[in-house]
Each structure stands twice: as structure tokens, then as C-alpha cells.
Amino acid sequence: MAEGKFATSVTCMDGRIQLPLAKWIKENYSVDYVDAITEPGIDKKVAENNELDSIKTKVGISINAHKSQLIVVSGHYDCAGNPVSDEEHISQIKKDVDVISSWNT
């Protein structure tokens, strides 16, 4: 069993956002660690229910093994895996919240 308080970040693999996002999550949600689940353009994949088995399994591990009680879903500007407008990223992230909430892992 892992020690400390965990959160889960479902985010793009882009290295420009991972450290700043983990820092923001730690500072704003008082967690010690952030499990990072990454794929290129992950906000689009989840919104479109595309190749979700691996993502769902990893979220389940974070929740069950690390007792994560917070899942943060993100997208970002200039994403090579999902080059869409900010508005589209926001729309996809809103869908992602519904999809991930339905998993009950």
C-alpha cells in the first residue's frame, strides 16, 4: 500500500505540461503525489471512447492501489496529438469528465 495522498492526472504525453500540472494539482488539492496517465491527445481519445481499455485500467490502479480520490483531466494548446481549438479542448474535457465518472473503478 502506498503512503501519502494521491491524485490522478489524465493528460497528454507532452512534457511541457506534465510538471506544471502536477505542481498545480499538489498545490491546489493538498496531495503528495500525482499518478500521470498519458497518451498523445488523450482528451480526444476519452471523449470519443477511443482505445480506452488501457486508460481505464491505469485509472483503476491509481484509485484502488493508491487510493486516489481526485482525477484531473486536461488538454492543452499546441497539442500535436489533438490540434484543435481551445473551445474544442474544453468541450472534449467536459465529455471526458462524464466518461471517466461512469467507470466506477
Where are these regions (language model features)?
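Divalent-metal-activated hydrolytic enzyme cores
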Residues: 1-21, 29-33, 37-54, 61-70, ...
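Short, well-ordered beta-to-alpha junction loops that form the rim of enzyme active sites
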Residues: 76
